[in-house]
C-alpha cells in the first residue's frame, strides 16, 4: 500500500505518458502504414490499369510521379543504356558518329572540362593536367564510348573520355585518372614524360605512364625536354599537348611504343594495353585500331579507335611533332591527340598519316617542326569538337546514323521482339499445285472434248475413254502451263465435270425410286449396248445421259446389294424362330426324332423360298430374274442352313435358358411355346395351328407355320386325350404346388414336360398357362430331371428315343405302369411319365423339397430319385436364375417349358462351360448371328 501511495502519481503519469506516446506512435505507424499500403495499392492498381489501358487521373498522377522518379533514374542512367547500344558491332563505326554527337554535346562540358584540365594542366603539372586535358579532348572525341567501356577497362583515356561524355562524372573519372596520371607523372617526375606518357597514354597514361614511367623513364626526360615544351605548346595549340598526347595516347602508346619505346610496348599491356597494343600494332591501319579496340571494350574501340583513325591520321603528322619534340612516340601521340583535339591540322595531317601505318616508324623519323605547328593551334580544340564530329561522318558517314538512332534510348519503349526469319521462296520456282490444275484442267478440257465426243460418238463407252485420254493430255498441258486453254475450257470443263458427277450421283436416285424395275432392266440391256441410241438426247442434254450410265452400274450394284440384303433378311427371319424351335426340339429329340428333323429340313427349304419371294418383291421390285435367282440361291442356302442351324442353335438357346432363361425364353420359347401350346391345344382344341402361325408368321412367314404343322402331325395323334387329362391333373397339382415354390417348382414342372413330351406330346406343352404355378411345383422335378436328361442325353440317347417314341404314341397312360416298372432304371425313369415315378422322384427330391403329389401328374418320368440330389444342387445354383424366369413365366407361360426342355437337355453338360458365354450371346449377340457362327 505504501508503495502504491508513494509511487501512484509517478506510475500514473508514466502510464499516461507511455499511453500517450504509444498512442501517438501507433497512430503514426497506422497512418504511415495505411498511406504506404494505399500508395502501394494505388501503384499496383495503376500498373494493372496501364496494362489494361485504363488510367486513373488522381491515383495515377500521384503514382506516376513516384514511378517517373523511378523511371527518371534509368533516364539518368541513360549513359548505361548507351553502352547497350554500343555492344552491337555496328556501333563500332556508329559509335564515332554517336560519340561525335556526344562530343558535340560534350565539348560543352568536355571541352570546358578539357579546357579546365588544359588550363589546370597549364597552371598545374603541365604534363599531368595536359594529359587530363588531352584526355578530355580525347574523351571528347570518343567521349561516350570511352566513358563506359574504357573506364572499366581502365584505359583511363577512354574512361576519362567517357566521363567527358557526362562531364561531371567524366571530370571525376578524368580527374581520378589524371591523379593516377599525376602519380605516374610524378613517378617519371618528368613533366614531359608525364605529359608525353600521359598524353601518349591518355588515360592509357596509366597504362603507358605506369609502363612508360617504368619502361620510359629515360625517354621521358628527353621527351620532357623536347616534348614538355612542345607538349605544352601543343596543349596550348591543341588545348593541351598532353591533351593531344593523352587524347591520342593510344596512338602515342603505339607510336611511343615504336618511338618512346617500344619500351612503352609494355605500357600497352597496361590497363587497356590490349586496345593500345592493338592500336600500337594496328596504328598503321587506324581502322584496324578501331576494329580491334572494340574487343577490349567497344567504348575503347570507339573512342580510342576513332581517335586512332583520326588521331592515327593525325599521328602521321603528329609523329613528326613527336620527333620534333625529341620523343617521336610521345610527340606523335601528341599530334595525334592534337589532331583529335584540333581536327583542322590533324585532319590534314591525318590524311597523310591516317593511311600511313608507319606511325610507329614515323615517330622516330617524324619531323619535329610539325609539332609546334600543331602545338600552336589551340583553337582546334573546339575545332576538334567540330572536326571530330565532321571527321566521324567522314570516316563513319555510313554508320553514323544508326548510332544516332540508337542513342535516344527510351526506357519505356517496348523491347524489340526478335523477328522471325521466314525463308523467301520463289513462287516461280515452285511447281503449280498439280491437284488444282489437274482438276481444273480435267474439268476444263473434259467438257469441250466431251461435248465434241458426245455428238460424234453414239456410245457412252467411247466417250468416256476419249475423255480420259484427253484428260491425260490436259494434264500435260497443265504441266506446260497453258492458262488460256484452261480459261477457255473452264466453263465447258465445269459442265463436263458436272456431267461426270451427275452421271454418277444425282440421276441414280430418281432411277432407283421411280424407275427401279423397268429402268434397271433397260439399263442392263443398255449396259451391254451402252445405250447407243440414248446418247444423242444426252448430247442434247449433257447431264442426264451420264446419270443413265450411272444408273446402269448403280442400279446393278444396288440390285446386287439389295439381293444380298434380301438374302440375308429372309435368312435372318428364317433362322431365329425355326432354329430355336428346331434346335431345342431336335436336341431334345435328336435320337428319337431324327426323322421329324429331316421333315423340318425338307419343309423349311420350300418355305424359305416362299418367304424369300415374299421378302424379295418388297426389297427388289426392280428385277424379277434377280429376285428369282436370289430366291433360288436362298432356297439352296436355306436348305444347307436348316440342318446346321437346327443342330448348333439349340445349344445356345438351351444354354441361354440355363444361364439366362429370361432372354432365351423370349426368343426360343416364342416358337417353342407356340409349338407347346399348339401341341397341347391341338391335342385338346387343335389350336396349335392358329397360335403357331401368329408367332411363326411374325418371325417365320412360311416355315414355322409348316414346321409346327409337321411336328403336330407327328406328335398330335398320340398326346391329345392323355395330354388333356394329364394337363388337367397337372393343372390341379400345379395349382396346389404354386403356393410352395415358384421358381424351383417352375423349373421342375418344365423339365418333365420337356423330357417326356419334347417331340412327342404337345399336350404337356399346352398347359403352360398353368405352367406358371407348375414351375413352382416343378422346381424339385426340374432339379432332378435335368440331370437325368443330361445323363440320358449323353449316354442314353437310345433309351430316350424309345421313351419319346412311346410318348409320341400316347402310351404315357398305358406306360405309367411300364414306366413304374422301368422306374428302377434312370433312363426309363426319365422317359416314363407315370405319376408313380413322379411320386418316387418327389420323395427322393422331397428330402429337401415338398410335396410329392404335384410330380406324379407330369414329371413322373422326368423325376428320377438318383438325379434328385444333383437337381437339389442345381436348385441351389439355379434359384438366382429362377427370378428371371418368373417374369418370363408371367409374360410367356409356354416358353419356360420348352426352354426348360432345352435347359434340361443342355444345362447339366453345358452350364459349367457355356452358361456365361450363352448369357453373353443372349444379351449381346443376336441368336441369328450365333446360329450363323455355328453354321460356319
UniProtKB/Swiss-Prot annotation:
Polar residues biased stretches: 166-244, 341-354, 453-462, 752-763
UniProt membrane topology term: Peripheral membrane protein
Keyword Cell membrane: no
Main location: membrane
Ranges annotated as biased composition (Acidic residues): 59-68
Ranges of biased composition (kind: Pro residues): 366-382, 851-868
Chain intervals for the UniProt region annotation (Disordered): 1-315, 341-795, 818-893, 908-936
A Pfam family hit: AIM3
GO biological process: barbed-end actin filament capping
Ranges in a coiled coil: none
Protein name: Altered inheritance of mitochondria protein 3
Taxon lineage: Eukaryota, Fungi, Dikarya, Ascomycota, Saccharomycotina
